[in-house]
Amino acid sequence: MTTINLKDSFKAYDVRGIVGETITHETVRATGAAFVDVLGLAGQTVLVGGDMRPSSPEFMDAFAEGATARGANVQKIGLISTDVLYFACGIENAAGVTFTASHNPAEYNGMKMAKAGAVPVSSETGLFDIRDLAQKYLDEGSIPTVENPGVVTEKDVLKAYAEYLRKLVDLSNIRPLKVVVDAGNGMGGKTTPAVLGDALLPALPLEIVPLYFELDGTFPNHPANPLEPANLVDLQKAVVEHGADIGLAFDGDADRCFVIDEKGNAVTPSAITALVAEREIARAKAEGNEQPVIIYNLITSKAVPELVEKLGGRAVKTRVGHSFIKAVMAEESGIFGGEHSAHYYFKDFFNADTGMLAAMHVLAALGGGNQTLSEISASYSPYVASGEINSEIEDKAAAVDRVRAHYAGAPVEVEDSDGTTFTNTEEGWWANLRPSNTEPFLRLNLEAPDTPTMERVRDEILALVRQ
């Protein structure tokens, strides 16, 4: 009998818990069994991989025990980034799981799951059903074994992943570039040499300067979360010191990628979204797609939909969160999607997100001409953004109401979708207030035509929120 409640570790999109407390050998084994039962995978192959966290190998074994007991064959694909799992699930048309807690601290681990074709498993597509059945197995103290349990095999998919990405974006003929890559001791330390280096494939015209490529799930240098500006400082310094053309920072499971220009300044994910959208629209039109669809979330710069429409594409706005983007990508036949959090989704990558492929598009744009990255990104960044500002506040609804009351009667449109968005059409600014689902935070994102307007509106709204 167990006292662990799986509701503590099963979130809306994935599983995350503290090793030995809310995620253990037993909970993972039960989850492996429930994964097979709920998704009907008996007799089929389930892919199992994991990141560099110390507990990942044991958890991969535990999941395999549960999955094979219920009749699935397990193919272990070893040490992988999360986008390698999506690639393998897509190319092999098989369901799978990877053990990672992304950028969470060292004491955490977790699971990201996908159905065949890299379709995400979330609370709305079976994750909570898996949780409930796993809880039943835990409470009963045993997992029934089928008459013909599955077998475990191993396969390395990293070279196939690297070849696949190189076919999507050809970097072989770009001008030579010096690229500093901060892997943050995460899985980018393994995928970067495979895709951009010469570890598995012929060398590209890229000189890679590695930062923190040693796989180490204790993150000895800095947290592997490039969304926090403090974690980009080492990369920014290195880009300037080495006279590099560009810097890339990956998070722990290497599905997100942040970009630094040659001056050491961060390039916003909105600018990267616009850059990649322009390249993908041109390619889709050349292939006969008359109005390619680009997906963006409501916190992305309005420069993105403006550019997409100017190029003859169609821009579709969605809520924040990868399951929403992936669902809309499929529904709308989108060719590319971008989020302010540096998640980038590609139709050619099974509608899944891959920071590496986005980085390759940036390298192709940079290496295909003579402009610097700061010059290129400036053309995609006509507006001034506040970045995401958190206010710790208990009564979030009352705070939003104060802002709503303040702008009543002004030329401000109010839209209640994924928080509340205020748009001033006369002054050309918009602001979104969105409550965090997991923390007592109200998040402000704001964009304006110039810095004085952005700062004035930002200070106005924060004063109302925090009073």
Listing of model-derived features with the role each one plays in the protein:
Residues 43-51, 178-181, 292-298, 335:
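Short glycine-rich phosphate-binding loop at a beta-alpha junction
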Residues 109-242:
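Gly/Ser/Thr-enriched, mixed-charge loops and adjacent short helices
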